[in-house]
Amino acid sequence: MTRNGPDDATRKGTSEVDAVEGLLAYAHSRSRWGGAALRSLTEAIALSRTLAGKSPEEHTVLLARCLRTTAGHLLKRNRAVQALPLAQEAVALTRSIGGAPLVVSLTCLASAYEALHRYSEAAATLAEADAITPPDD
């Protein structure tokens, strides 16, 4: 099924996780300058916060992804001040998880720091991300 709008993601019978995934996908298909993408991302954050509140061990990574995606969207719109707290929250959520989710969150946070001309913090954040060892396969 082709997604035509955010309503497709939140229609009756769609699981909450699928709804969040649909909202994220819809936001990626919108122009970065329009408001539809940001509204979808905001709704995805709200839904994933509810899911993470019910089952943190299962949905914290999804919430962090929504926060990172929204921060990245805001960075593309030159709104680094608004992106920074979202990126910081994503890092805080993924610290206990570690691995790839933490590395991606740290990279997003470093991008926010760079956009704000906080280069030493960006470098320290990237160094922390580089120090994380990948899991053995």
Residue ranges and their predicted role:
Residues 1-51:
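N-terminal alpha-helical interaction modules that lie
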Residues 45-53, 88-93, 130-134:
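Amphipathic alpha-helical segments of tetratricopeptide repeats
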Residues 14-17, 54-57, 61, 100:
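Residue signature of alpha-solenoid helical repeat architecture, marking inter-repeat boundaries
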